[in-house]
Every structure is written in C-alpha cells, then in structure tokens.
C-alpha cells in the first residue's frame, strides 16, 4: 500500500522502479561482475563503421574502451560521489578526491583502479544490497533509455561527460532514496 501511494505521489518511472525493487527484495541476487570486455566487440564494430580498423591507433582503442565502459563508469562515479566505495579503494583516496572534484572522470578511475570492471568488492556493505537489486535490473534500462537517442546519433554510447553524469546521477539518487524510504534499505 505504501509503495502504491508513493508511486502515485512520485508519478515517475523511478517510482515504479523502486516499487518493483522493493517488491522483489527476496529476488535480490549477488552482484555479478560487469566489465567493459562484455561490450568491447560491439563498440569496436560500431566504431569501425566510422573509421577503417586498419587505421586504428592506440587512441582509437582507448576511445572504444571508453564507449564500452561508459555505463559502468557513470555508476562508479555515483558510488564514489556518495562515499559508497568498498575498502579496496581506500588506497586510491587521492584519485577518489579527484573524481569528487571532477578532475578525474569515472572512466579514468575505472581504467586505473578497476581494470574496466565492477565487482561486489567495489561497493561498501551499506550500498551493496541496493546495487544487487538495482544495477542489472533497472539501472541499465534507465541508462539506455536516457542516452539511447544520443547513442543512436553517434552509433555508440556517448563518451563520459559530467553533464551526462549529472543526468543519470539524479536518477540513481532518486532510486536509492525511494528504495531506502520503502524499507528495502534498512
């Protein structure tokens, strides 16, 4: 009942997402690794549609990795911004501060400290239950919906930008707050 009222008040897809997450907490699954390797071949093909692979440079390959990891980098940036990173990243405190100050992108941090991948150890115990409910089930859908028109025009995901990050960060924050409010984040 509370979830239904909340959805009516919020009136957004996010409200429905959180209702779905709250209703399916029992279906929470351990966070599986998400890594740019999963998307590299597709991004390579899309990039090759614009430039002959025979002419690819190291910079081109770096750009392809950025495209393949953008959704991961955006989420990791939100995790860092909100202090929800795992103990594994405490040694990277200088770079964490650079990300928070927007002097290092999430993609740069992901490449330097995570080998272009996320796993459960990248998250604090406090946020991991939310990530397990939200990341693969809803975040990816929200990311795709938000950036699909831009991606279609470019033939690939947009590269990391702080403007795009701000758009998706609002949605992640809203989903997290509603998730906590609905009692899933006890």
Regions found by a protein language model. Give the residues of each.
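Amphipathic protein-protein interaction modules
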Residues: 99-167, 171
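Feature marks short, highly hydrophobic, charge-poor N-terminal signal-anchor/signal peptide-like helices
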Residues: 1-9
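Residue-level detector of alpha-helical secondary structure
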Residues: 169, 173-176, 180
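N-terminal low-complexity, intrinsically disordered segments
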Residues: 15-104
């Amino acid at each position: 009942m509370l979830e239904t009222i909340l959805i009516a008040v919020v009136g957004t897809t996010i409200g429905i997402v959180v209702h779905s997450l709250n209703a399916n907490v029992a279906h929470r699954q351990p966070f599986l690794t998400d890594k740019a390797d999963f998307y590299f071949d597709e991004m390579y093909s899309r990039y090759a549609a614009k430039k002959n692979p025979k002419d690819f440079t190291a910079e081109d390959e770096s750009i392809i990795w950025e495209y393949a990891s953008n959704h991961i980098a955006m989420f990791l940036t939100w995790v860092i911004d909100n202090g929800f990173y795992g103990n594994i990243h405490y040694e990277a405190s200088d770079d964490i501060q650079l990300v928070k100050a927007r002097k290092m992108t999430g993609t740069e941090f992901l490449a330097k400290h995570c080998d272009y991948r996320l796993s459960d150890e990248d998250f604090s115990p406090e946020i991991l239950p939310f990530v397990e409910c939200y990341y693969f089930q809803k975040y990816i859908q929200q990311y795709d919906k938000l950036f699909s028109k831009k991606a279609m025009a470019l033939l690939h995901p947009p590269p990391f930008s702080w403007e795009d990050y701000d758009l998706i960060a609002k949605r992640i924050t809203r989903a997290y707050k509603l998730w906590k409010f609905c009692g899933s984040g006890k």
